[in-house]
Amino acid sequence: MADEKTFRIGFIVLGLFLLSLGTFLMSHDRPQVYGTFYAMGSVMVIGGVIWSMCQCYPKITFVPADSDFQGILSPKALSLLETGLSEVKSPQPPYVRLWEEAAYDQSLPDFTHIQMKVMGYSEDPRPLLAPELKTGASSVREGEPRTAQAWMEAPVVVHRGSDENEGEKSHSQSSPSVGPQGSAPLASFHDDLDVGSSEGSSLQPSPNRDEPHRQVPWASRGPLDRFSDFALIDDTPTSEDTVLDGQAREAALPRKQQWSLRMKGETVQARAEEPEQEEEDLYYGLPDSPGNPLPDKELGFEPDIQG
């Protein structure tokens, strides 16, 4: 290895010497001589540099796994390899035999005897909660001691919430009155009362506020109507709806009449106070006189009379 390194260095130095010799001969005007030295020196320098660069990388040696080539390695290297392999610990668990795995699978508990029963909220779960001792039927041969396999049953009772039961009851109560479901009806706001009636109702307190609210028992209360402000367009009105609409219109009509009479009185009073001259001053067209709209006296000339 040292001889090879020395040879590479000498090769590069010889190439540099040839380059310097060619430069010296070039000064004496001999082109056929210094060209040869230049070419040889450049080739030797480039080759030596590339050779040195290739030797900087580590060498890869392939060792065959055949037993015939074990004699090539020294006994010291073999001992080092054996000690290194013994020190390395494999992360894998030790090998488990198949019969041990089968025995472990058989030792696991069997959950086939578990049963599930759905109970309502009103049912009593105490009969199920009472522990029962059962003995499993095992095949017992004659002459062998009889071993009783016993286990305890621990039932888990899960009740459905009261909200679900109330929802089911309300659904069952409302289902007979509901007809066959078709297309979903449209919805709209109640616009029977106009703005005037709403303003009049806001000025006058409603008589319904003075009436005490009826106490409705909690049991008879159904789910809250969240869409009470909507009216179904496609839905056919029932008798109760028509009665309620008639009462609302009757209560709204006197308020509307009072408001309209008040507005009419105010407009008549305002018209009486305005002078008629102001109306004539604001008129920009021809006067509404039954006669000639353009009298001759205003024109300032007499029409020609041809007799």
From Swiss-Prot:
GO terms for cellular component: basolateral plasma membrane; membrane; plasma membrane; protein-containing complex. Residues 172-183 have a biased composition (Low complexity). It is a multi-pass membrane protein. The keyword Cell membrane applies. Residues 198-207 have a biased composition (Polar residues). InterPro entries: Barttin. Changing Y95A: Increases channel conductance. It is found in: Basolateral cell membrane. This is Barttin. The lineage of its organism: Eukaryota, Metazoa, Chordata, Craniata, Vertebrata. The gene is Bsnd.
